């Protein structure tokens, strides 16, 4: 009995202290070394020894992929400068907007069921320097590692599943909130500036714009004439800049009860950092305050800028309405965006809705008094989008659907 007790304690200690630092393949492992080092430089050498195995594996795999990405980075960059793909106003991207865990993944997957739309896949956003000329190598060496990256703990991941293009901006050189939120928690203040772009220097903003546009250009090469569908929660705070970069772009915003979003983001950040952080996390209260401020500021940016979007290029939906009547809401969205909606499109969307409906949903503990106070500060968002407290029970039942 005593030996069993000791064995149990050893396993519990390992789960608590060892597992978080195991060197899983990092989502930046297919980014070339120059992009990885651009992110790591911001840590100012603050890598606790417990994270060194994870750091070493990241640098090793990145070094291999640096060589693999060279042909595409040299050849395709020159090709795009000489013959950039044309993007007309009537074929500008469709952007899915909404804060993290508001239902953006569910909405993106529904839209991606439309054969006329093309979302980037996970290999494309995680290896933005390699996915055209280097696809054969990428498919052989990296795609089998996708299940090991632990991204699927927070979002559906697969070689052909729709992905967030902000991962591409991160893996092109840390131009994303993800670099702070998932990789360097102690440097969130620096990387969070790429969320709404307001505090960037002129050079930083120019670099972000050029990389965002270049990534869309590369996607256009492999889209086969289809309209691009892009989803990243950070785009919610970038509407003004996206309209400048992509005239004629269309936007669909999804909202959810602020309490449910807040709860789910606590889980999201914890799991991201558990899998990918190279530094110790911030104290819980400090991280929750960052989430609260960021969530409120993101949606306020959107509310301030949505009047700039032409009426025919803009639609909004609430997650609970999309769950209750997916086809009714999708048909309404298509009408408001003036996009064609086919019978085949409806059948594929119904399959997506059924798949997401069967997914396991997370349960979260009750809020503390401090967390309740933070949720109360988000009440303006519930009023703005009609996500009143009366629907919180429904949102808890829906769980974490993106």
What are these model-predicted stretches?
Residues 113-123:
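Post-Walker A helix-loop "phosphate-sensing" segment adjacent to the P-loop in P-loop NTPases
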Residues 236-239, 259-262, 323-326:
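Flexible loop/turn segments at secondary-structure boundaries
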Residues 125-228:
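PAPS-dependent sulfation machinery
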Residues 97-99, 229-233, 319:
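Short His-Asn-centered micro-motif
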Residues 96-112:
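Glycine-rich phosphate-binding P-loop
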Residues 231-232, 242-267:
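Conserved phosphate-donor/acceptor-positioning beta-strand/loop module used by diverse small-molecule
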Residues 2-70, 194-198, 203-209, 216, ...:
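PAPS-dependent sulfotransferases, especially Golgi type II membrane carbohydrate sulfotransferases
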Residues 74-96, 125-129, 134-137:
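N-terminal signal-anchor transmembrane helix
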């Amino acid at each position: 009995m005593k030996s069993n007790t000791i064995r149990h304690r050893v396993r519990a200690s390992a789960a608590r202290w060892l597992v978080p630092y195991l060197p899983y393949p990092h989502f930046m492992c297919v980014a070339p070394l120059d992009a990885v080092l651009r992110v790591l430089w911001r840590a100012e050498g603050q890598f606790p020894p417990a994270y060194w195995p994870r750091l070493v594996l990241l640098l090793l795999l990145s070094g291999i992929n640096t060589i693999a990405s060279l042909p595409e980075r040299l050849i395709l960059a020159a090709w795009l400068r000489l013959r950039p793909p044309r993007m007309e106003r009537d074929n500008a991207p469709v952007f899915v907007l909404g804060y993290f865990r508001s239902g953006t993944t569910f909405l993106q997957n529904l839209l991606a069921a439309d054969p006329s739309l093309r979302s980037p896949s996970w290999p494309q956003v995680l290896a933005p320097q390699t996915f055209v000329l280097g696809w054969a190598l990428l498919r052989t060496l990296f795609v089998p590692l996708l299940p090991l990256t632990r991204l699927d703990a927070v979002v559906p991941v697969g070689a052909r599943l729709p992905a967030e293009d902000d991962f591409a901006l991160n893996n092109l050189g840390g131009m994303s909130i993800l670099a702070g939120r998932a990789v360097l928690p102690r440097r969130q203040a620096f990387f969070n500036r790429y969320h709404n772009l307001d505090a960037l220097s002129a050079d930083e903003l120019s670099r972000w714009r050029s990389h965002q546009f270049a990534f869309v250009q590369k996607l256009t090469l492999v889209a086969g004439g289809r309209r691009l569908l892009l989803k990243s929660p950070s785009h919610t705070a970038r509407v003004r800049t996206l309209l400048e970069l992509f005239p004629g772009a269309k936007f669909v915003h999804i909202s959810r009860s602020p309490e449910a979003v807040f709860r789910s983001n606590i889980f999201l950040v914890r799991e991201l950092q558990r899998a990918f952080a190279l530094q110790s996390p911030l104290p819980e209260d400090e991280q929750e305050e960052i989430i609260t401020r960021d969530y409120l500021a993101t949606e306020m940016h959107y509310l301030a800028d949505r009047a700039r979007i032409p009426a025919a290029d803009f639609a909004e939906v609430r997650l609970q309405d999309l769950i209750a009547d997916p086809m009714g809401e999708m048909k309404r969205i298509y009408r408001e965006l003036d996009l064609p909606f086919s019978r085949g499109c409806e059948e594929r969307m119904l399959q997506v809705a059924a798949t997401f409906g069967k997914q396991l949903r997370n349960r979260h503990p009750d809020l503390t008094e401090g967390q309740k106070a933070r949720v109360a500060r988000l009440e303006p968002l519930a009023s703005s989008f009609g996500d009143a407290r009366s629907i919180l029970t429904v949102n808890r039942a829906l769980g974490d659907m993106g």
